[in-house]
Amino acid sequence: MEALLSTPINPNNFPAKLWRLVNSPRYRSIRWDGRGEGLLIDQPLFEAELLSPPGPGGGGGTAGAGAEPELFKTTSFTSFIRQLNLYGFRKVVLGGPGGGKPAGNGPLHHFHNPHFRRDQPQLLVHLKRLTSANKAKLAAGLEVPCRPPNRFQRLLITSASAATAPLQHQQPPPPAGPRPEPHGPVAVGQFHRSFRRDSLSPYSCVSTPSHDHSTYPLKGLDRTPVPHRIWQNSLGMHPGQVETSPTFSDKGVPFPVLQRFPTEVTYTLQPSTTSVHVQQGPQTMVSSSQKYSNYTPSAQYSQAYYPTAVLQCCSPTHMDALSSCVTPTASSYAHCNYFQNPSMQSSYPVEFLPSNWPCSTTDENTKTEVNLEAVFQIVDELHSSPKLEMVKVEPVENQCPTSPSYRGQHILANSNNSNPCSASQASQLEPLTPVGSDIMSFVVGTEQAVACSLPQSPEYIYTIHTAQPVENSTIQESAAIQQAHVKLKEHLNHNPSPSSVVFVQEGPPFSTHQVDANIKCQTSSRENILPSEQMGFLISEMGPASKPSEDTGLATPARYREHRSNSQQGKSPDLHLLVDVACKQERFPKEEELKE
């Protein structure tokens, strides 16, 4: 039987089946003759054992019908004899050499073939099916090929050869352990399919850890030998990368064990209380993300997600191992621009500034402080200047008409009249004109009503109005002029000395109207000194009557130009705040003291 399996023929062919029947002690209907060169077949017993249909009462065979798998598709003995004749068997006359008595009462048939002999299964290769085509080939001297065995048949052939011959390996045997046995259970997951066509064994085995106890018995491959040469497995591993597993040292043949590759991905997810500390730098993040082996997740990991940008800019000392947000200290945010808020979990970067963020001094704050100091300095200098007082404008007999073509220029400085009265009036009013514009440029610069009550002093009197469009109303202007005359008379009673006069006109352009009963001037608004929507002042400087006004005009503009340059270095963003600060620090006398 085992000798037949080692023969490279198809086990499903008729010669192979006939060989197994003759050599099986189970069947008595077919056996060798006395010389071992022919077959003796008892027809009635053969039909009962092998040709009857499977079943408990089929044919009354003594061997038990249906015990052996079906060997022949036919149930006729004549068909079986036809198959013998087709493969070259010839019937021998009874009583000839090697004949014998039948085992039963029926007829006994004797067949002979020179390629079918006892203990010589290798001769079965020469048994050909003598069809018409094969006969023609044999007559022509051509070789008739036989059907080769399939993969399963080759596996059985290899198992048979392994059972008869000892294993010869190029690798050294295991150092300790008994002789390997051909049978034994094989762990689950050990077999790895190999697609090497030139390999005799279609399977290569990969061992599993020794603690895996789920096994199943090996049935079909229990006699599969390991080839005598070392082959390369399906993963492309060489003999130097395999080792003999001690797990299977006593389980038949030594199985090769695959070593770990550097590119092998192993996921071992287990809970651990140790924290994973994130290091600073993008290279560290990339290198750590590529290491999948033995990754231990942190048990303290929160639901917040920290992008790579945050991990790059935050130092490890201010980060609690992916468990809480970054400590809001000024040192940790020195180079951090964006921060992912863990409570919001938004997909866009959120700018985060801690509560104790140091407020840096900006240029705007510096300008504010400088402007405040400049205001106080100018106020102190104005305290020591000569007293300014509002006086009544003396009426003149001559009129001073001004052409509308001089719009946007000073009404007194641009007078081209050669009248001595107008010339003297222009010489008296021109020098002090820049004073009013300079003071207004840094004290009042708003288009809304000033809420703070300005303190009054004997030196300053402010007349502040909300910039509103002025219509052609003679009644309103006359009422305002009358109030101004009343105030001028009161101040003349206290200060009867002569003084110089500065007249600054405010408001948007308005048509010609009568200012006073004694003074008639056709004027237009000044655009080069003040905007049309700002306030105006009526300021006069009190001085000795003997001192000429031209000398005063030479010194005053120079002094206030310096004040204007200092005040215009930086404009205050909030003029109301400056006035409030000046009021609170009591730089000026209170209004009650002024009235007294």
UniProtKB/Swiss-Prot annotation:
The keyword Phosphoprotein appears for this protein: yes
Chief localization class? nucleus
Q: Where is this region: Disordered?
A: 541-576
Q: Which InterPro entries match?
A: HSF_DNA-bd, WH-like_DNA-bd_sf, WH_DNA-bd_sf
GO cellular component term of the entry, any: nucleus
Kindly state which keywords UniProt assigns to this record, in alphabetical order. Answer: Activator, Chromosome, Differentiation, DNA-binding, Meiosis, Nucleus, Phosphoprotein, Repressor, Spermatogenesis, Transcription, Transcription regulation
**Any one Gene Ontology biological process term?**
cell differentiation
Q: Which residues carry this modification: Phosphoserine?
A: S572
Q: Which residues form the DNA-binding region?
A: 10-200
Q: One GO molecular function term?
A: sequence-specific double-stranded DNA binding
The compartments listed are: Nucleus; Chromosome
Tell me the domain of life. Answer: Eukaryota
Record-stated family: Belongs to the HSF family.
List, alphabetically, the PANTHER family matched. Answer: HEAT SHOCK FACTOR PROTEIN 5, HEAT SHOCK TRANSCRIPTION FACTOR
Q: What does this protein do?
A: DNA-binding transcription factor that is essential for male fertility, spermatogenesis and meiotic prophase progression in spermatocytes under non-stress conditions. Positvely and negatively regulates gene expression to ensure progression of meiotic prophase beyond pachytene stage in spermatocytes. Plays a role in male germline meiotic sex chromosome remodeling and silencing through regulation of SMARCA4.
| Assembly and interaction partners | Homooligomer.
Give the protein name, as stated in the record: Heat shock factor protein 5
Q: Which organism is it from?
A: Homo sapiens (Human)
